Amino acid sequence: MYEFLDRRYALALYEVGEKNQKLEEYINDFGEIVHLLKNDENINQVVNHPQISTSEKKKIFMEIFKGKIDEKLLNFLLLLLEKKRIHDAEGILTQLNKISLEKHNKVVAEVRTVIPLTDNEKTTLASKLSAKYNKIIIFKEIIDKTIIGGVYVRVGDDVIDGTIKFKLESMKKVMLKEE
C-alpha cells in the first residue's frame, strides 16, 4: 500500500544488517516474523487489539522475541510497533528482498510454461535474459496449463509472451477487426 515507506524501512533494515554482517539472518528472521504476524492468531490478537497500548505490545514482543532474534532486528520490530507500521511488515519484507536482489545484481524471472523446462532450456533462457538485463537471473517457475503452450516470461515490469494462448488471442483480434 505504501510502497515508498515500505522501501525506506526495508532500506534501513538492509543497511543495518549489512553493517553488522547479519543481512541473511535478518532477512530470514524477518520473513519468519512476517509469517507469524500473518498466521498466528495470538500475535494477531495482540497487534490488532485496540485496548492494548503500544507500550504493552512492545513488552509482549520483547517477551516473545528477546534472545531469539538479533537485538537490532528486535529494535526494528519495536520501531514498527511504535510507528504503527507493524501491519506493513509484509510489504517491508517484499522491499527488503527486492533491495537484496538489486544489490547483488540479480533479478527474478517469472517463467510460465505448460510443462517444466529442461535444464538445457533453462540454461539457454537464463543466458539470453542475463544478456538482455545484464543481471544474474533467478527463475520462479510456474506450471500453467491455461497458456496451452509456449513460454511466458515476466522480469519486473517487462513481459515476453510467447504463449500459444496469446498468439491465438492476437489472431482473434485481427480477424474480428477485419469484419
From Swiss-Prot:
Keywords, ordered alphabetically: ATP synthesis, Cell membrane, CF(1), Hydrogen ion transport, Ion transport, Membrane, Transport
Locations listed in the record: Cell membrane
PROSITE patterns listed in its UniProt record: ATPASE_DELTA
What InterPro entries does this protein's entry cite? ATP_synth_OSCP/delta_N_sf, ATPase_OSCP/d_CS, ATPase_OSCP/dsu
What's this protein's family per the entry?
A: Belongs to the ATPase delta chain family.
Subunit and interaction comment: F-type ATPases have 2 components, F(1) - the catalytic core - and F(0) - the membrane proton channel. F(1) has five subunits: alpha(3), beta(3), gamma(1), delta(1), epsilon(1). F(0) has three main subunits: a(1), b(2) and c(10-14). The alpha and beta chains form an alternating ring which encloses part of the gamma chain. F(1) is attached to F(0) by a central stalk formed by the gamma and epsilon chains, while a peripheral stalk is formed by the delta and b chains.
Membrane-topology annotation of the record: Peripheral membrane protein
Q: Name one GO molecular function term.
A: proton-transporting ATP synthase activity, rotational mechanism
Functional summary from the UniProt entry:
F(1)F(0) ATP synthase produces ATP from ADP in the presence of a proton or sodium gradient. F-type ATPases consist of two structural domains, F(1) containing the extramembraneous catalytic core and F(0) containing the membrane proton channel, linked together by a central stalk and a peripheral stalk. During catalysis, ATP synthesis in the catalytic domain of F(1) is coupled via a rotary mechanism of the central stalk subunits to proton translocation. This protein is part of the stalk that links CF(0) to CF(1). It either transmits conformational changes from CF(0) to CF(1) or is implicated in proton conduction.
Q: Name one GO cellular component term.
A: proton-transporting ATP synthase complex
Signal peptide (from-to): none
The primary gene name is: atpH
| Protein name, UniProt field | ATP synthase subunit delta
Chief site of localization = membrane
